[in-house]
Amino acid sequence: MNIFIGKLAIIFIFHHFLFLYCYFYYIISFTIEFSIFTNIMLLLTLVCIPLLGIVAIAPSYRTEAHRYITNLPANVDPDTHIKLIALVISIITFLYSLILLLLFDPTTPDYQFTFHLLNKHSHTFSSDFQIGVDGISIYFVVLTTFLFPISFLASWKISSSTTLNGNKYNVKFYLCTMLLLETLLILLFIVTDIMLFYIFFESVLIPLFLIVGIWGSSANRIRAAFLLFLFTLAGSLFMLLSILAIYYNVGSTDFQLIQQYSFDPSIQKILWAGIFISMAIKFPLWPLYSWLYRAHAEAPIAGSILLAGIVLKMATYGSLRVLLQFLPDASYYFSPLVQTMAIMSIIYASLATLRQTDFKALVAYSSIGHMGIIALGLFSNTIQGIEGSIILSIAHGFVSPALFILVGAVLYDRFHTRTIRYYRGVVTYMPIFSVFFFLFTIFNAGIPLSANWIGELLCLIGTFQFNPIVAVLAASGIVLSAAYSIWLYNRISFGTYSQYLNFTKDINRREFHLILPLLFLTILVGILPNTILDNIDVSVTTLLYQV
């Protein structure tokens, strides 16, 4: 009897053990499969969120019947609901990108969260939809998603225009164009196929052309939009020829396969020249800068924020991803040429800034100078220089949009003029604005403990290791940036209140919440730069020494 009970107990225990084993086996298997599935879909979901916003906004309409149905008061803009949809979608996209940043593993240089849609090659050409992020691209993605909610808030006052033949879909078209631009920029920074990189690099031009050309601030907006279009198109033709030549040699457009291929030095130089023309226009470097300040001067406030904060960074990312990674010998060979153009950009832009009478053009010229410093760091062929260029790109993505908000949204919305000589003594009636304006002007000049200072310092250290004379010349440009920054603040804020200005209120709650996160992040990165440097170090080191 005891033996029977013992056998029964053994069978019972074995049965439960087998049941628990099968249970945990299926649970673990499902968890692994689900984690693999979610890992694959993470980046694809990030791309789809702004597209869902377009789908939600596009079918909407605004009529008097809609006002009656929704019980909106006569003084309430019926476009508010679609503005809220766009704002919420952009905030969700930003929060989702932060989740990706938290899940990102900075200890490996490999692409993460990869997704590969197609793998079918034709006899003539092959290009697959492949996406992934590494330590370099993840921060450009986060910067992109961060600036779009700010852009939507900055342009909150935009309303449907009655000048375009009574067009009632103006705001809807504007919001859809902005969300499309966000989608294209995200795709640009996450694709791992050079042909797709080219497609999205050039596709960004379409919504930018519409934003500047339709919602620009004056009659010159059409000329500025076409100038932007023609400059970019001219550079893109050379870039396309180089990419086709890369495919002809490698037989693939995959980033990883191209990186493993060793090009002949003479071929590298030809390919490098074709791609660099497009990048030099996007930076922009001297003498290819004339489209930028015109586009900034005519663009709406959201267009200026995105141009300065993200679009110029396409050149930084493209130089890192294509020129330095795939064509390292040619990049080293042409480094003196790039540094000469960068020095000319820094000095010329700084001197031209001192002569400006339009404060949006002044901030635009200052962007040209800062992008010149970024180009110096990129082509210094040092870890410090490249990491400094990434930090300065991020810092410029905070400071320059903040300056455009302060002068292009706050001041221009109140006084309707961008001419600097009409402003004086603003601190008397706008003290909070003056504090923010002071902080960002000194940040723009590279004051210590700001993100700009960290980026400029690392760029100069890297450049000094490559060529001390070039570093000294670049430092003189930074001194000039301090000169025009202090002059601009002194001219607008101090002195007796200008007779050309009406008394007005200080910045409102919406404008305060626009500027505060930019201020916080600029100081945070300046005090704790290792929060970014530690995450990009492996990718930058691999990029520099693997080739």
What would you call each of these model-derived segments?
Residues 64-66, 77-82, 110, 173-267, ...:
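Alpha-helical multi-pass transmembrane bundles of energy-transducing inner-membrane proteins
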Residues 41-49, 135-144, 195-207, 269-277, ...:
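Structural signature of hydrophobic alpha-helical transmembrane segments
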Residues 2, 6, 22-42, 52-176:
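Transmembrane helix-loop-helix hairpins at membrane boundaries of multipass inner-membrane proteins
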Residues 156-174, 331-336, 357-363, 425-428, ...:
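Short, amphipathic, aromatic/basic-enriched membrane-interface segments that mark the entry/exit
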Residues 105-128, 163, 220-223, 236-290, ...:
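Juxtamembrane/interfacial segments at transmembrane-helix boundaries in multi-pass membrane proteins
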Residues 54-58, 152, 186-187, 210-211, ...:
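Alpha-helical transmembrane segments of multipass membrane proteins
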Residues 55-71, 150-163, 211-217, 283-294, ...:
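C-terminal ends of transmembrane helices
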Residues 400-404, 469-503:
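Predominantly late transmembrane helices and immediately cytosolic-facing juxtamembrane segments
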